[in-house]
Amino acid sequence: MDRKFHLCLLLVILGTIIVQGAPLENENDADPDKPQKYRYYLKRATTEKKDNDPAKPGCHYTPFGLICF
């Protein structure tokens, strides 16, 4: 009984975490001021280029800062 209860509780918690991480609105409606929009930031980091961009070739802006490969 305890094992089934704990397994069920674990599945509910993992399901909640997965659902919380999924975006509910369209990617085009993403607000850049909200840091939880990770997919928006990831897309912007690989596609957006600024005029006075200090990044060297092979560097990308991410929510975690500038990452160079």
Swiss-Prot record:
Coiled coil feature spans: none
Species assigned in the record: Heliofungia actiniformis (Mushroom coral)
Location(s) in or outside the cell: Secreted; Nematocyst
Note: Shows a propensity to bind albumin in aqueous solution, which opens up the possibility of using it as a carrier for directing albumin binding as well as potentially increasing half-life in serum. The peptide is found in two different conformations which could be explained by a cis-trans isomerization at Pro-63.
Propeptide segments, given as residue ranges: 22-57
Tissue and organ distribution: Tentacle (ecto and/or endoderm tissue), and possibly also nematoblasts.
Main location (coarse class): secreted
Protein name per UniProt: Peptide Hact-1
Signal sequence bounds: 1-21
Role description: Peptide with unknown function. Has a limited effect on human peripheral blood mononuclear cells. Does not show activity against both Gram-positive and Gram-negative bacteria nor is it active on the 26 voltage-gated ion channels tested.
GO CC aspect terms: extracellular region; nematocyst
UniProt KW keywords: Disulfide bond, Nematocyst, Secreted, Signal
Disulfide bonds: 59-68
